[in-house]
Amino acid sequence: VWSTKTNQQMKKQKITGWLLISGAAGVFIPYTILSIIFNYPDVLRQEPGSILTQFHHGGNGLIGTWFAFAILGLPLLPAYQLIGQQAEKHSIWAKTATMLGVTGLIVQMIGLLRWTFVVPVLSEQYVNTTDPAIKAAAISSFSTLHQFAGVLLGEHLGQLFTIIWTIMISLILMKAKFFSRWMGWLGIISSLIYLLAQADLFATVIPGFPVWEMAGFLGSTLWLIWLIITGILMIRKKTGFE
């Protein structure tokens, strides 16, 4: 019975590892494509009219890439839940971490999906008219959507909850001796760097707010690396953290 239970635990752990790796890759690949074809994420802080024009020129390929960016990270949802289930024996905060992590992923997905289902309509209205009133209405609608779904939901709440999840899980996995301290600190440090990118969001409403331009790119890249390494460890380790 013990052997069967152990085998089930190890199988669940390997599944979790593959979900982490596939989810991280699913985020990284469309992110990289968007940085090449749409100057993402720098484009987010350009003038609304410029963003709408560039988006329209990107056509269906750009819309599809944004959809992939929103959806291909979905394997992280069950991965977070499986990690949380395994971590509950080691921390009373595991359920809270899972709730925050899953919520963060969902609100980021909602924010990203605006580029697939709402922005195409606004860019079409903006580009295909010479009426200043229609252009102004499109810009106003886009600006409101951009600030709410993008800055508030996706970039602030989504990233903040993800950062908190990463720090909590790093501490729990270190406590469980699942991986070495350097891996735990990689998760924590990448999260703290990622947290500094929140300054860019405040700068959208507080002119002159100090911003470290590299924080978002560096923090998110280190976070993806941490996810992938954690996934590899879960696949390769012969012992779990039960």
Language-model region placement:
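Hydrophobic, aromatic-enriched alpha-helical segments typical of multi-pass transmembrane helices
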Residues: 7-242
